[in-house]
Amino acid sequence: MTISPSLSASLEAVAAILAPARDPWWIIASAAVALHGADPGDVADVDVLISANDALRILPTLGLKPRRGAPHATFRSGIFCPWRGTALPVEFMADFAYRSGGEWRLVQPATRQKVDGNGWSVFVPDRSELQIMLSGFGRPKDIARVRNLAALG
């Protein structure tokens, strides 16, 4: 796995912040693709799926105010909280859903794979579950990431 120094620094910060989490959490989207060892394209931020309880308990310790996500045609979050205190922006999301086939689909990973970096550990959905998730997002960049994950074999 080769990831950029800025992604590594951001993941290290996320791991430290979420150490007291009581519920499972995951890195998803482009950063998760990179952690699986596939080409994610541009990793502009780190998307973190977290429980609402942990978001309300942990994020205020960073001076953040968890809020309902802004309305969007394709994505929604019960809580959406951006954090700019790392090399890459981090977006914490609770009760995250995407619209596919006219229905909202809640993202609740069933798998949780630990990935160790240089002094940190984070969690991602397994490769097949991540591929299904990204396919559901349906954007061209996500479909390209699905292909890149599939190319890993």
Describe the residue ranges of each PLM region.
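Compositionally biased terminal segments of proteins
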Residues: M1-G153
